[in-house]
């Protein structure tokens, strides 16, 4: 019996895959537990529409991330911090601070987890990588100056 998996099933397949399962396994395990449904023509049509919608959504997200990466490329983010002797900052500039400043200066909402940098503890210029989407990233220059 052909079955469309509704959830990941260990050893059988992932959600959305069509598998061949024995009739007993499908009727007694997969179908009653809501792990799969019979692969009828109407169910296959629904599955194909869902996959197409997911593909379009992923394409839109990729295009949006590429546009954002292009708009941020070679931008300079200026930040001000209090520093002591030798240009050492009181406190440090973290990825959260950079994400907040990006929102203020460029009106771009980026999650702090997508800002890839070491904690900045000195005044100066730094290259910071922004991972906007899998395989899409850009670099910006962060300039830390004293008040």
Curated annotation (Swiss-Prot):
Any single Pfam family the record assigns to this protein: Ribosomal_L9_N
Disulfide bonds: none
Sections of the chain in a coiled coil: none
HAMAP family: Ribosomal_bL9
Protein name: Large ribosomal subunit protein bL9
Domain of life: Bacteria
A single cellular component GO annotation: ribonucleoprotein complex
Keywords of this entry: Ribonucleoprotein, Ribosomal protein, RNA-binding, rRNA-binding
Signal peptide: none
Annotated GO biological process: translation
GO molecular function: rRNA binding; structural constituent of ribosome
Protein family membership: Belongs to the bacterial ribosomal protein bL9 family.
Keyword 4Fe-4S: no
Name of encoding gene: rplI
Function: Binds to the 23S rRNA.
Keyword set includes Ribosomal protein: yes
